[in-house]
UniProtKB/Swiss-Prot annotation:
It comes from Legionella pneumophila (strain Lens). PANTHER family: BIFUNCTIONAL DTTP/UTP PYROPHOSPHATASE/METHYLTRANSFERASE PROTEIN-RELATED, BIFUNCTIONAL DTTP_UTP PYROPHOSPHATASE_METHYLTRANSFERASE PROTEIN-RELATED. The active site is at D79 (proton acceptor). Nucleoside triphosphate pyrophosphatase. May have a dual role in cell division arrest and in preventing the incorporation of modified nucleotides into cellular nucleic acids. Disulfide bonds: none annotated. The lineage of its organism: Bacteria, Pseudomonadati, Pseudomonadota, Gammaproteobacteria, Legionellales. GO terms for biological process: nucleotide metabolic process. It is found in: Cytoplasm. SUPFAM superfamilies: ITPase-like (SSF52972). Belongs to the Maf family. This is Nucleoside triphosphate pyrophosphatase. Its EC number is 3.6.1.9. Its main location: cytoplasm.
């Protein structure tokens, strides 16, 4: 960490390499300790009419799970939901599901909702969500297949990597890139300063 910033101990409760890079871009020192909570089980039990609440709930559960083992740290946790027509598009995990997701999203508008939470000593200090709205081009089968072979975005909600070649799939985007990537930086920066986790 540079001398410009003074900070308290921070943990990022996420295994996402993109969130790791975004946090690093802020010049912070932090540990990475992913949560062991069962996301799929929580999603299955949740009411589909309260999707933003689901994202916030997942972020809180992740942060609280890690906080019980690291009470001296401020825990930052996040969750990302890709939603179209009140349906959540989870990570496809394989090629066949990714093809299906891109077919369904082709030519349509969908939302990427980034949910954040900061916890210390098992107390929730801050929670936040931000939405980006994206519209894909009408994608041919050839385009879908070529894109998936090029990037294999099977660990990405929506079956695309916006930080890479995925940008070429879109005709309109409303919202910040870091929201699409799952970690809205300016709200997080302001929260860390307001909570006196980071000082300048």
């Amino acid at each position: 960490m540079s001398k410009f910033l003074q900070q308290k101990p921070i943990i990022l409760a996420s295994s996402s390499t993109i969130r790791h890079k975004l946090m690093k871009s802020l010049g912070l020192d932090f540990l990475v300790v992913p949560s062991n909570c069962n996301e799929e089980e929580i999603k299955t039990r949740h009411n589909s009419d309260e999707l933003v609440k689901l994202g916030i709930t997942l972020a809180k559960i992740k942060a609280l799970d890690v906080s019980q083992h690291y009470p001296e740290h401020y825990i930052i946790a996040a969750d990302q939901l890709c939603i179209a027509d009140k349906r959540v598009f989870n990570k496809p995990l394989n090629h066949q599901t990714a093809v299906s997701h891109l077919r369904e999203l082709s030519g349509k508008q969908h939302q990427q909702i980034a949910c954040l939470c900061i916890v210390k000593e098992s107390k929730i200090l801050w929670q936040y969500h931000e939405t980006a709205t994206l519209t894909l081009h009408h994608l041919s089968e050839k385009t879908i297949e070529a894109y998936l072979q090029a990037e294999k975005p099977y660990q990405s909600c929506g079956a695309y990597q916006y930080e890479g070649l995925g940008k070429w799939l879109f005709k309109e985007v409303q919202g910040s890139e870091d929201t699409i990537l799952g970690l809205p930086l300016m709200p997080l920066v302001n929260a860390l300063v307001n909570l006196k986790v980071v000082g300048i």
